[in-house]
């Protein structure tokens, strides 16, 4: 049904200029913005290998805002890349092209069974991420927005991770955000929807990339999981008499570098590769080494987080939020919780709470894209139809890229 509507409208309007479409769409946005307290988004996320589509609804009242994930469908293809040791850039595009329409169809059907047959906006990830996969999702979203005459919201992927916790929990700004994934490792002070100050970021590779490579070096089967998740399942803290030498050094832990405002994981990766290639390891030693490789990386993250917390005005910070795919790791959660206990003991009494999204919302997903799009729409922003995917896009520069429009059709 959606395809029929899309084709019909698109055929009628194919001669209409982009300018006319934008003017019509802006009028429709203003009308919707003024009259609706409930907003529903159809959202698409294709920044890496997962093909994810969701319908998200927010309902505002005078006292609170209720958020609801009507449906979320994510097609995972990670098993196809184990033979390549990572995401294959050509195959991943083909998989998105093959699967996206089917996932959209399933999501729309699921939403219809919940009584939702119309959407107020079309949301999609614009970046940062892999250009090919992003383009598949972005072009599909543009077609849906034009065909259904709905506003387009092209969302910042890491902004969505930073806001993901608000989708499920009543958490207000400001809060400190640890964003840990395959492409990013950042400590961010999230002050508002658009104000995200980078406190610490990685100087080389991301922690998720590091963990994925460690799993590859150790030859751990992925079992339809991300390599980092397979590493977590494989690891064991149990030690024997031959394992003491398998404890990697904590990065940037010297007197000269311990206070530096950066993460670094490339040295740990080189250490892991060197030990595994030169040292024969039995199964128990591999399991212990896998645990220690995680521990060293997470201890590094915790040290920098503790340093940042000591420097911040803690009277304004109520939450330490951990988001992104690596935030699913149970060892990381435990170590961050221990870090807050150290802060209480060393620094000052504080009621900062460690919170994180549910596992499915930690990983790449369209629900967080839909929620973020709705918040941007409420703030008066939409996206033009000529927006292009962005590979690198700092979270503290959300509005600096071309393609944002205000309610009066003015470019930002």
Swiss-Prot record:
Subcellular location, record wording: Mitochondrion
Cofactor annotation comment: Binds 1 divalent metal cation per subunit.
Gene3D superfamilies per UniProt: 3.30.420.40
UniProt catalytic activity: L-threonylcarbamoyladenylate + adenosine(37) in tRNA = N(6)-L-threonylcarbamoyladenosine(37) in tRNA + AMP + H(+)
Organism: Schizosaccharomyces pombe (strain 972 / ATCC 24843)
Highest taxon listed in the record's lineage: Eukaryota
Function: Required for the formation of a threonylcarbamoyl group on adenosine at position 37 (t(6)A37) in mitochondrial tRNAs that read codons beginning with adenine. Probably involved in the transfer of the threonylcarbamoyl moiety of threonylcarbamoyl-AMP (TC-AMP) to the N6 group of A37. Involved in mitochondrial genome maintenance.
Entries under InterPro entries matching the protein: ATPase_NBD (IPR043129), Gcp-like_dom (IPR000905), KAE1/TsaD (IPR017861), Peptidase_M22_CS (IPR017860), TsaD (IPR022450)
GO molecular function: N(6)-L-threonylcarbamoyladenine synthase activity; zinc ion binding
Main location: mitochondrion
Native organism taxonomy: Eukaryota, Fungi, Dikarya, Ascomycota, Taphrinomycotina
Keywords: Acyltransferase, Metal-binding, Mitochondrion, Transferase, Transit peptide, tRNA processing
Protein known as: tRNA N6-adenosine threonylcarbamoyltransferase, mitochondrial
A Pfam family of this chain: TsaD
Single GO cellular component term: mitochondrion
Subunit structure, interactors included: Homodimer.
UniProt: substrate binding residues: 179-183, 212, 228, 232, 328-329, 363
Protein EC: 2.3.1.234
Gene that produces this protein: pgp1
Residues at which a divalent metal cation binds: 157, 161, 364
Family, as annotated: Belongs to the KAE1 / TsaD family.
